[in-house]
């Protein structure tokens, strides 16, 4: 358990005040999914510094398993005896486009429609991409991007400027007035937002503290 030496530096449990201090490293596929938990955590544990990094699902899982972060949040269920998980919620995958892209704007898009459109995908390792492509293949439809981009913010900008149609979970759409979101009417693809941490580190004070904050309504 030599990896836990880092916790003597990054966090500790003050027996005198029963408060947690130090730093917690969080890697998430989107900050949106943990905003409310972070608010609760900061209110309960104001002395803990939060280091938040954004990455795709593969990067998040690797960071947890490599001891590069205490908490991970991704848009898919995770399995493995080395991991403990908490389901935060589910959200359907939606197509997004510039309001000027379609004329008129359709109510929804089918996989057949998508195959004819310029698609913008996130990089390999994005669970949104993997889920969408997998479901389309089940219906014998192959979806291919004209642009592949790293990061959700870059995807939003390309889509908002009319370069193609992108995909995000409903929770990640945000408030960009340039965008319209559309149902994928032949699809049931959804994201299951999952909080994870290593089983071997379940007694680390900042991890226990974050889980406590996640339980708050």
Regions found by a protein language model. Give the residues of each.
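Flexible hinge/capping segments at coil-to-helix
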Residues: 18, 83-119
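Alpha-helical "hinge/linker" immediately C-terminal to small N-terminal DNA-binding modules
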Residues: 1-18
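Short beta-strand->loop
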Residues: 84-94, 170, 177-192
């Amino acid at each position: 358990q030599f990896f836990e030496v880092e916790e003597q530096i990054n966090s500790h449990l003050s027996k005198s005040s029963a408060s947690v201090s130090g730093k917690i490293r969080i890697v998430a596929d989107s900050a949106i999914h943990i905003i409310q938990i972070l608010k609760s955590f900061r209110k309960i544990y104001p002395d803990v510094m939060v280091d938040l990094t954004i990455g795709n699902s593969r990067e998040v899982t690797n960071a947890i398993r490599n001891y590069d972060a205490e908490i991970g949040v991704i848009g898919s269920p995770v399995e493995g005896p080395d991991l403990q998980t908490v389901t935060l919620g589910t959200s359907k995958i939606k197509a997004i486009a510039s309001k000027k892209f379609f004329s008129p704007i359709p109510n929804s898009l089918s996989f057949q429609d998508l195959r004819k459109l310029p698609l913008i995908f996130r990089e390999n390792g994005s669970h949104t991409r993997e889920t969408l492509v997998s479901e389309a293949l089940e219906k014998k439809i192959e979806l291919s991007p004209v642009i592949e981009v790293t990061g959700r913010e870059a995807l939003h900008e390309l889509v908002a400027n009319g370069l193609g149609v992108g995909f995000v979970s409903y929770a990640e759409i945000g408030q960009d007035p340039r965008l319209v979101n559309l149902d994928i009417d032949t699809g049931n693809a959804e994201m299951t937002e999952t909080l994870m941490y290593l089983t071997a580190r379940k007694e680390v004070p900042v991890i226990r503290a974050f889980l406590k904050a996640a339980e708050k309504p």
